[in-house]
């Protein structure tokens, strides 16, 4: 039903991550070191919040709070409101709140058609926007190539690459400036390593998409590593959540991925079906 781009690949990715975690644990090494990478902290941006609210005061307050969480140097802004003016007003509210030195990528979550994406992208070109992410449907490579050719702001795609070949095809089509694969969809650690080689050959900066607890390890060994997307979704059920210091993710010096569940929290949040 889902084909090779659906549930089967998600399952393979999960098993692959577990496999690499087990190997690193057996070796007594953090996964990053087991993969041959350094343990240096990874530049991270805060991807919690900054959604499509029309309350610009609340949006500004949230932006200041997100930057202060870990002295972040970047935070993602969600756009895709009913009008261009509303999106620009929201972006400016965040920019005014955090100042000129904080990088502000934006994500449209595939919410626009190509004509509107070009229109809003042109407006964002004048707003010191760090990147434009997934403005149109994820597999419209012709459209993304047109955006990259006509806009000044870097074009970021990749969370919907299903396997490393998708990344190769996107880069061959000149459909993006930067790439950001998702561990669940790219093929786990093995798929990530393949994608990292492709990105290196293309000279394409490569960021991660969510799963920061594992992504930090694979980013450490990525030659063109760019930004780790940080979200704290799993923190409430983790014994030791991923640490952020001075805007960087600190790779845990524990065997494997270092992920350990807070069993009491897991039971507290569990749903009985």
Regions found by a protein language model. Name each.
Residues 48, 159, 210, 231, ...:
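Residues at the C-termini of beta-strands that transition into short coil/loop
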Residues 15, 19-23, 195, 215-219:
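Buried hydrophobic packing segments
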Residues 46, 180, 229-230:
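Structural signal for conserved beta-strand scaffold positions within catalytic alpha/beta enzyme cores
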Residues 1-104, 109-111, 115-118, 122-126, ...:
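N-terminal capping/lid subdomain adjacent to the active-site entrance of alpha/beta enzymes
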